[in-house]
Amino acid sequence: MDRVVRWGVLATGGIAATFAEDLRSLPGSEVVAVASRTETSARAFAERFGIPRAYGDWASLAADDEVDVVYVATPHSAHREAAALCLEAGKHVLCEKAFTLNAREAEELVKLARDRGLFLMEAMWTYCDPVVRRMTELVRDGAIGDVRTVQADFGITGPFGAGHRLRDPALGGGALLDLGVYPVSFAQLLLGEPDRVQADALLSPEGVDLHTAMLLGWSEAGASALLNCSIVADTPRTASITGTKGRIDFPPGFFHPERFVLHRPGHDPEEFTAEGSGAAGEGLRGLQFEQAEVARALRAGETESPLVPLDGSLAVMRTLDAVRDRIGVRYPADG
């Protein structure tokens, strides 16, 4: 693909708007169509961002011959339905995280994409951020020795009332899939899939997690991760990686960082940044990095991204399932 990458945006919520804003900064890519469950919402979104076509149903977007790739921005309870619809219509897909409600749904999407030879990627923007990529290079080059611990947290306060989507089991509510996916993905970026999962949580009257603490373990690596997520507590939203020869600290906002600090015995602290990194800068939020990776992969004829591999997304979903099993959270879609 050597022409402009033509995007369709499926859903019109806040993250879809951020996506459309950031895409304006990416040369060689443009949003050409948007879809919502209502034509009114789709048209309002199209007018806001200068998008030529607006659809009041998802199927019309999936059938649009002028769309190369669809960004699925629905709540995660609809990710499987929306992404499968687009894949079945022959569209490449970038799907928001959490990838799906459970690992079974994720496996179905991955199989569908692989069977059809289509590109599919979870929108884990953290993995595409140049600062995070710089960190992983340092860790893999042995800058802090063997990783022994990872600590990360992502908590916010609403308040989120009983009618909010984050409190609705049918919509995959709770802290884990909305926020916990970040610290879990961060730990697994460095250590892969854990072989031990422990968790404890505070549950809402509706049966979703308001706050979850996780302890993940990797027997062969001799490593562990202490992770927290919450929709009732404003946590620091920091991360730290400790190895046998040093430590890396991320300031608040570790999931879209502008910098990190490397600490090693006998050395002054070293601060690392990366060109064009972080969410700030020209009003961008940081989604341009995942957008650029999708465009690069499509132009290269790749059906999976090496930065956000599908096997990695499946492994994260298995961990999230294991955490929900430990804390007793089930969704209607689990069956």
Predicted features, each with a name:
Residues E108-T126, D146-T149:
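Rossmann-fold dehydrogenase core element
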Residues T126-Q198:
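Predominantly a Rossmann-like dinucleotide-binding segment in NAD(P)-dependent oxidoreductases
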Residues F49-K111:
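Beta-loop-alpha module in the N-terminal Rossmann-like domain of NAD(P)-dependent dehydrogenases
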Residues M1, V69-Y71, R296-G335:
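C-terminal helix-rich "cap/oligomerization" subdomain common to oxidoreductases
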Residues M1, S185-P257, G286, V294-A300:
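Contiguous beta-strand/loop segments that form the cofactor/metal-binding neighborhood of enzyme cores
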Residues Y55, C95, L120-E122, F250:
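Hydrophobic residues in well-ordered beta-strands that form the structural core
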Residues M1-F49, V329:
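N-terminal Rossmann-like dinucleotide-binding module
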Residues S277-A292, V308:
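Active-site loop of classical SDR/Rossmann-like NAD(P)-dependent oxidoreductases
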